[in-house]
Amino acid sequence: MSSQKRQSTLSRFFTTIKPSQSTESTLTEKVSSKSPPLPPPPPPPTASPSLPSEKLLEFGFDGTKDSTSTRTTTTKSKDVEKRKSTTSSGSSFSSESKPKRPKEKRLTPLEKQILELTEQHQDKILLIQIGYKYKVFGINALKVSKILNIMYISNDIEDTRFHYCSIPDTRLHIHLQRILSHGYKVGVVKQIESTIVKQIEKTSKSSDVMRREVTGVYTKATYLGDESNENTKGSWDGLSSSSSSSSSDVPEYIVCINEVSEKQFAIVAVQPLIGEVIFDSFKDDISRQELETRLLYLRPVEVIVITNGSSEQISGPTLMTLKLINHNCNIIHKSGSPSENGNENENENENEAIEAIMSKYLNEKLVEYYSINFSIPIQQCFEYLLLYLNEFKLTNIFTIPENITNFQDSKKYMILPANTLNSLEIFTNTTDHTTKGSLFKLLNNTKTIFGSRLLQKWVSRPLVHIQDIKDRHQAIEDLQSEYNHVVDSISNFLTKIKYLDLEGLLSKIHYSSTNNNNNNLRINRKQVYLLLSNLQEILILVQKFEKSIKSFKFKSSLLIQIFDELLTISQTDIIIIENFLSMIDLSFIDCKESSEQCRKFFKRNSFDSIELQYQNIAQYQQQIEQEQLEIIRKELGNSKLKYVQKDGERYLIEIRNNQRDKLSKILDDKDYILIKSTQTITRYRKKSVTEYLKLLQYHEEMLIKTCDEEFQNFLKDLDSNYTLFYKIIKNLAIFDCLLSLTTTSSLPNYTRPTLIDDDLTILVKQARHPTIEQLRPNYVANDININIEYDKNRVLIITGPNMGGKSSYVKTVALLTVMTQIGCYLPCQNATMGIFDSIFIRMGANDNILKGYSTFMMEMLQCKNIISMMSNRSLIILDEIGRGTGTIDGISLAYSILKYLIESEFKPLVLFITHYPSIHVLEQEYPNQLVVNYHMGYQEIKNNTPGEIPEIIFLYNLCRGVVNNSYGLNVAKLAGISHDIIKQAYRVSEKVKSDIELKEYWKFAHSLNKALKEGGSSSPNQLDDIDYYILSKHSSL
């Protein structure tokens, strides 16, 4: 560039250009005619560079059109007007002149479409398919770019609505999960028409933008891996919804809570992955302990809370409980019922209104089923869940009544309260909240995802019917007894499918069967084939061992039922699975492109509609490859000419450049279209071939569409056999759980407990804590001797030094009870166990800041719940009741609560840990060893150095009697507290102890002296004081 040109260019940016008089006067007239005169301009500042957007305007680029076309249409006068309007100072505008307003940007059809979609779906992040990418626009693009750590692109466009970030379409499934994990609702927008179909069918103008629609809406709990690519590993392996989730992951529920009143609640929870529906009605108080228990089981990620019409917000205790369980939980508040019609007090009208809404999503038979079997509060939960799940196309989760279960069924199993789950570390430990050291981790040796899911239910719901427990124990004994090749073969099969969630795949088929949108099927072809082929394989395996199964000598009715059902299905219904598989062409597995998999999934001649499209394709292929090729050969005088395919372009002919001049006239006259030219060859396509090729491509698109439609019908046929497939999977899951319990029960020194249904006996020889012994060697075993056949040893008061093993002992008792009723063997020499229907534990010192409760308040609320919910088959464990308040009040409450439990008509079994020695006198108040004092063994080593505390050695064994000293100073020493502080504390402790003892001696001496003087006329109170002193001194010895 010459210096003159460079100077000219720079002056356009940095120098104020004075327009000619004629141009200025014309511009002034135009501006003045449209707007009132402007005030005189301010004094001109020093010249400054234009903004980047202004520079672009000066060069004729407005950001919406191609820069070349813009420059061509921009005249000199327009260029001057732009410069004048963007120049900040230095121009000689008159007082009447005003800069012309910038011309409004014209939106392209695609931009208009993006804005329309964004306007219609403001509550979600939209991933819009444009070419081979999915793009996010506007403010949502900024959020997504931060989540995915990808580039946020503005392209110097001032309109932030079109700033974007993008991801490849092949990575949609992976990135979508990452966005959903942050709690967002996401809509996937796909292009639902192709260029060729648009041209042939002429559904819209050729200039119109491609039609796009929201084909799927997802949240964390409702995404089932729908957008996984056919060729991804997760898709082939058939993993559950998250594809990367492990079998130990907590299920993700969507929960609807109905706050009927301050104390009455209804709840319905759905797990979309497996189609499970759980309901319950219950009473609760301000502590929301019952609600917390249910939420702890369900671990919801999305919650709908219904409040009555008079309440405009969720109650504080309910909201705090939800945040306590999952602070990232998405909470939606709904006031009243969507079916309210002004007669909300009339149940009949309310019922009719609910039925009207349900009938939009369910058939008449199902609506009647829900109306008859569930109360109105439960029906309202169903109603709101139907409305909520409709957006995600999951309403048919309510179409299988067999999947609907009650949260609590006292005749079958017990529900462990939230405090019990946490204190016993059933699913997670209390240290880092992982599964390490938990009971579930010990018991979970399952081989499959669906087996682990069922075992989690078994662990959280111990059985209460003695025969059901015996069946599981007997199944373990049968599986342990001797090697069985049938059991081993099925076990190997389960290991083979450890990453395949058959239960989840079956649910996906059910959802997809009613989804009319082929762009958003919940399951892909490979997953369908995996499900069917593995179901066939297990049935063939059972058929193979038919004689062995019939000759089984199993005593367990549970095992007999599993093998009998599988054998019956293999003999009568395997033909159904074989018929489905006979329609599938296995060559589709090797296809790399999803469109090719679609075409080759079904065998030829399986469907007339597909064959019709194949015939049309063959017809046009023949036209192009035979008739048109023959014409081309004659025209170009080359009998050996063949089509070539390059860069995805089909049916091209290649002509060397040195022959092109000779054939130029023929190529022009015969309508040959130039496709591409290189240094050596030029590629053409004849115009008539192009027309036939369009028709061929159209029918290829129609073939894919037809294959998708037939695949949809195929899924409907599969879904009609849902019950059959579910029965096979359920039996496999039960067998997997029994194998898992057998593995744990085969650990060293585990034994089958003897069950007693008559009383609450717990007699265990050399009992060990099941999880601690796995983490620590040389665990000290203890005997458990609780036999209340004659109302003896029903209440155990346990004292002892800190860190002596008191909590470990009572947890061992509770865990052995839970393991027994789950159906597992116990870590001990031998055991005789009674059957409990509830286990309550009050342990630990935890406040609840979210609920606004202090440590002591939480302690008292938990005690109140235990007292109100206990039964005649309850195991109650109380740890240091009353320690959260003053000593006098604490002792008084501990004494009164324990005495109430002793005298209760329910007569529960109670283990009471305390550091209050005075409570031990209850042993003397109740005869026949109803209350017994125990302590954890230790050995005290006296220290001859004055002022030094004695050393103690913890023995961790349970001994009869009471201990007055908790040896807290020794624990402080172990914790590393300064030696000087401990010495000072020891001196104070000894002085206080001697003062108390001296006071007790004087009180005793005074009472004894008065009694001796008065002889037989002593008052009962005086005699009680003497008895109390003598008994306390005797017990301490």
Curated annotation (Swiss-Prot):
Disulphide bridges, residue numbers: none
Gene Ontology MF annotations: ATP binding; ATP-dependent DNA damage sensor activity; double-stranded DNA binding; mismatched DNA binding
SUPFAM superfamilies, A to Z: DNA repair protein MutS, domain I, DNA repair protein MutS, domain III, P-loop containing nucleoside triphosphate hydrolases
SMART domains xrefs: MUTSac (SM00534), MUTSd (SM00533)
Stretches with biased composition (Low complexity): 66-75, 86-96
One cellular component term from this protein's GO annotations in UniProt: nucleus
Domain of life: Eukaryota
Record key words, sorted: ATP-binding, DNA damage, DNA repair, DNA-binding, Nucleotide-binding, Nucleus
Compartments, as annotated in UniProt: Nucleus
Amino acids binding ATP: G800, P801, N802, M803, G804, G805, K806, S807
GO biological-process terms attached to the record: mismatch repair; mitotic recombination
PROSITE patterns in the cross-refs: DNA_MISMATCH_REPAIR_2
Region (Mispair-binding domain): 102-221
Gene3D superfamilies assigned to the protein according to its UniProt record, in alphabetical order: 1.10.1420.10, DNA repair protein MutS, domain I, MutS, connector domain, P-loop containing nucleotide triphosphate hydrolases
InterPro entries, A to Z: DNA_mismatch_repair_MutS-lik_N, DNA_mismatch_repair_MutS/MSH, DNA_mismatch_repair_MutS_C, DNA_mismatch_repair_MutS_core, DNA_mismatch_repair_MutS_N, DNA_mismatch_repair_MutS_sf, DNA_mmatch_repair_MutS_con_dom, MutS
Region Disordered: start-end pairs: 1-107, 229-249
Keyword DNA repair: yes
Biased composition (Polar residues): 1-30
Pro residues biased stretches: 36-47
Function: Component of the post-replicative DNA mismatch repair system (MMR). Heterodimerizes with MSH2 to form MutS beta, which binds to DNA mismatches thereby initiating DNA repair. MSH3 provides substrate-binding and substrate specificity to the complex. When bound, the MutS beta heterodimer bends the DNA helix and shields approximately 20 base pairs. Acts mainly to repair insertion-deletion loops (IDLs) from 2 to 13 nucleotides in size, but can also repair base-base and single insertion-deletion mismatches that occur during replication.
Assembly information from the UniProt record: Heterodimer consisting of MSH2-MSH3 (MutS beta). Forms a ternary complex with MutL alpha (MLH1-PMS1).
Family: Belongs to the DNA mismatch repair MutS family. MSH3 subfamily.
PANTHER family from the UniProt entry: DNA MISMATCH REPAIR PROTEIN MSH3, DNA MISMATCH REPAIR PROTEIN MUTS FAMILY MEMBER
Listed name of the protein: DNA mismatch repair protein MSH3
Origin species: Candida albicans (strain SC5314 / ATCC MYA-2876)
